[in-house]
């Protein structure tokens, strides 16, 4: 905490002080244990600290009492009160595994309770009742969670260490910002499949520089016009009438509340649209993701689109995208989309192969999908784009080549292509655990399928790589949503499950009632790293662009790295830029990760605060 910084404490000492201060706020604690039958038992008990020791006062009528007598497995939970939390879903909490010791009645027992009853007068009435007992609690190991991405493990010897989080937000092995010798040489053994795997390094590095603020504090920031005039709106519609087998994201099977959700979206558009900050913005991109936005009824889509146009200034060349499935579209909806400026559709195909469509739980056969895509292109004047997933169980090279051929034959304007990622909580994850589906991931198979799909489309000479997972038809799809994202543009997130950033504040909408807001206190430095991360999502990186963000010394280190990668066949190093090969695109997120580590001080010589180049000068303040 800020109040400790002036006292000369180390970071670990400050963390200990914060944790100790957190415990001091409590007069009771939630207690969990296990019954003799192995069932979890939960209750609560009055809690008191005296002369450096911790005590609870329990009653034999509690269900957990007999378990405490026979079971050493006990955990305490201290959790912030709802009334004082910034958001109920983000309450600070501390869990401790503990050992308990019954305090025998005697002089010490009476002394402790004499002090206990000063803070809890009920002790005076119950201390002499035989069914009440005083227990000493010895803290063992614990975990303190102080924010949505900030947690600390506490060892039995009271050492406090920060929990390292992966890009997905799950605890993972510590992401060392030092570059290993194998990484330096390009000897990768595990492939990073998504941008989040590499950009997560930046998020983790800077998460300490963020603080949670309230909605009212955010809207105070929005009272001023924006400095950067270009902006993006992202709208999330978390409803589907059929859930893909690989999906564990924020989606809901459709029910009767689409009308309520429409009302919610319109109210959000109005709320943000009236702020001076958003009024000063020219919206360059509107992107509806999900879920399946086209699951909304025609009149609901009209209300939503009309509200966007009424509340925001959309540029004449605004890219307006909706994600969709084929079975959720009809001619009436297409007419409404075009009426309100929708000029890009992203269709979740995933696979044309019958086997793949069955495994991924898709609707329609290959022939039906092909026919419906042709009809869509005939009736919709904008871009028609698709998503393709490869390396699903037992997929063959012939099947992925056929996917590429159909994309080319239909003249699809762009296609995303992702290697299948199994996420906890998806149907596919459950099937694998229950042995009803076998997934034997092989890196070499992943490579073969990736190369076969990519090279087949490139061989037509009608397609080119736009970024690591996006192939576009030449002269057609610009995919400005991802370009503006990589540039660090403001993205206003609307809808449950939506995430974005405006006014240097990260926003994530949890439900219709709650969102959390994390304001960055180190904006300039963090944004520069994000720009570097964005540069390395493309097949070509020009040195002139890179030098805007790094010192000459760091650039020289990176250039040596590029030559190593060139020797591995990942790229060609030209006089003015690097150009990734097919193999380099496959390893693109790994390459981006190593570059970011180098810039974060991974060579052991420089740290993040020293690498940036501003007006020809270097310095920590820049």
Role assignments for model-derived ranges:
Residues 498-622:
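Charged, E/D/K/R/S-rich low-complexity terminal regions of large eukaryotic assembly subunits
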Residues 227-262:
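Canonical Radical SAM [4Fe-4S] cluster-binding loop centered on the CxxxCxxC motif
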Residues 63-122, 129, 139:
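Short, structured beta-strand-loop surface elements
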Residues 1-17, 123-176:
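C-terminal edge-of-domain segments
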Residues 223, 254-274, 284-289, 293-552:
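C-terminal scaffold of the Radical SAM
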Residues 2-69, 444:
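An N-terminal domain-cap segment
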Residues 79-83, 236-240, 417-424:
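Short glycine-enriched loops at secondary-structure junctions
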Residues 173-230:
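Flexible, acidic/Gly-rich N-terminal and inter-domain linker regions that tether
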